[in-house]
A protein has these predicted regions:
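Phosphate-binding site of ATP-dependent enzymes
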Residues: 157-239, 262-267
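Active-site "cap" helix and flanking loop/linker of ATP-utilizing ligase/carboxylase catalytic domains
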Residues: 203-254, 285-309
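Active-site nucleotide/adenylate-binding loops and adjacent lid/helix of ATP-dependent enzymes
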Residues: 1-6, 91-179, 183-184
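Hydrophobic beta-strand scaffold residues
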Residues: 35, 80-81, 109, 140, ...
Length: 309
């Protein structure tokens, strides 16, 4: 099969995309496919037409490749592509929309509010905080509504003293989500397959205050370990990850992130429709423990590639 491998782009997650593409390229070669590298830029429609491929393997992360825009283009061009479709990708990218859906499905989320990037940078977010349901909480997390890899994610230890005025923000997200900080362990659950199944989970223990961009992509930034918790709560998180996958309308692959408290209550942090896919990323690590090889996931995604979904 002639496969167009799309990666890169002028986004905060360009380097992550290229790292994923490197591993995927090796897997495609092992599987015997013909590979055409397609680096994302403003002329992407022409690059895709010129490549004359049977299918697009989407190795993009973040804006354009993960938020439904590349998917919409490929739907119009009627070229099959991997991962989720246009609408599901757009929904999964927007943390606030996801939270609204989760609440409607009675899946626990962390309390918070949204604020524009402009209000954030001018410290007007404090007015919104004082009028929010978390006005009595001073320890908060702030993250872009539409971005990934913990880009521009901040731990606010004291909301009364914290200022964004001197902080340079790199995200293109127009809005931010500010939530109360709940102490707990971060649990990652992998969902794979056309008939979605939660294949396993792991706990992430960052070496810093939280699982930020540096912890995710630096050597020794975090430790991955088995989840030590009661069987009932582990089973509940696995079931909830599949429920989230189906609720958003995701396809073939997703990673749900949960916060597990010492009382074994869990909250969904977010869902990722296009999880990192280097050889050492979380999804391949969980899959390997379940006896699923990296190349098998790549082949499954190619086999299930489609457009218009």
């Amino acid at each position: 099969m002639r496969v167009g491998l799309v990666f890169g782009g002028n986004t905060t997650e360009c380097d992550v995309s290229k790292s994923s593409a490197s591993g995927i390229r090796g897997a495609l070669q092992k599987l015997g496919h013909e590979i055409v590298d397609i680096e994302f830029d403003k002329d992407i429609p022409l690059h895709i037409l010129d490549a004359n491929v049977d299918v697009i393997y989407n190795s993009m992360h973040g804006q354009y490749g993960e938020d439904g825009r590349l998917q919409g283009l490929l739907d119009i061009m009627q070229i099959p592509y991997t991962h989720s479709g246009c609408l599901a990708s757009a929904l999964a990218m927007n943390k606030q929309l996801c939270n609204n859906l989760f609440k409607g499905a009675r899946i626990k989320t962390i309390k918070g509010f949204t604020v524009s990037k402009e209000r954030l940078q001018n410290d007007l977010w404090k007015e919104d905080w004082k009028n929010s349901e978390i006005a009595n909480k001073t320890e908060l997390f702030c993250k872009p509504v539409c971005d990934g890899s913990s880009v521009d994610t901040f731990l606010i230890e004291n909301a009364n003293e914290f200022s964004f005025k001197e902080i340079t923000l790199h995200t293109k997200s127009k809005d931010f989500l500010i939530e109360e900080r709940i102490h707990g362990r971060e649990i990652q659950v992998a969902v794979l397959g056309r008939e979605p199944e939660a294949v396993g989970m792991l706990e992430v223990k960052p070496n810093g205050e939280f699982y930020d961009y540096k912890a995710k992509y630096s050597e020794n930034g975090a430790i991955h370990c088995d989840v030590e918790a009661g069987e009932e709560v582990k089973h509940a998180m696995l079931e909830t990850a599949v429920k989230i996958h189906n609720l958003i309308g995701l396809k073939d692959i997703s990673r749900s992130e949960f916060l597990l408290t010492k009382d074994e209550e869990f909250y969904v942090l977010e869902v990722n429709s296009h999880p990192g896919f280097t050889q050492t990323s979380i999804i391949p690590e969980i899959a390997a423990k379940a006896g699923i090889k990296y190349e098998e996931i790549v082949e499954m995604l190619l086999k299930n590639a489609s457009y218009g979904g």
